């Protein structure tokens, strides 16, 4: 089964709100591996949205979706969405 990745870009408007999000969201991420958290991503082509980028790895697309759509994470996501303008995608690994 191919791994899946969640990539989220965030243009942070409320740092305190994002800090609260981080506390709540971290409690939901047992099934994820944090691969990257970058506040200074180097744009090598085109334009990039956001002041920080997060890349999470999951064992499968199903695991990524189960985490993202869970009641626990959706409660946390509301905090993130209130504190930042965000974009997110699920990427499908090879394999």
Task: Please tell me what each predicted stretch does.
Residues 52-54, 86-87:
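Generic beta-strand structural signal
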Residues 1-52, 59-69, 92-95:
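Short S/T/G/P-rich N-terminal loop/turn motif that feeds into the first structured element of a domain
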Residues 61-89:
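C-terminal structural segments of small proteins and small subunits
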């Amino acid at each position: 089964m191919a791994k899946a990745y969640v990539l989220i870009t965030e243009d942070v408007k409320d740092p305190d709100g994002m800090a609260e999000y981080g506390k709540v969201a971290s409690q939901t991420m047992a099934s994820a591996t944090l691969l990257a958290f970058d506040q200074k991503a180097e744009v090598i082509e085109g334009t990039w949205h956001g002041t920080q980028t997060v890349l999470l790895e999951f064992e499968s697309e199903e695991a990524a979706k189960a985490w993202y759509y869970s009641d626990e994470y959706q409660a946390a996501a509301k905090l993130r969405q209130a504190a930042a303008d965000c974009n997110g995608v699920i990427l499908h690994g090879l394999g």
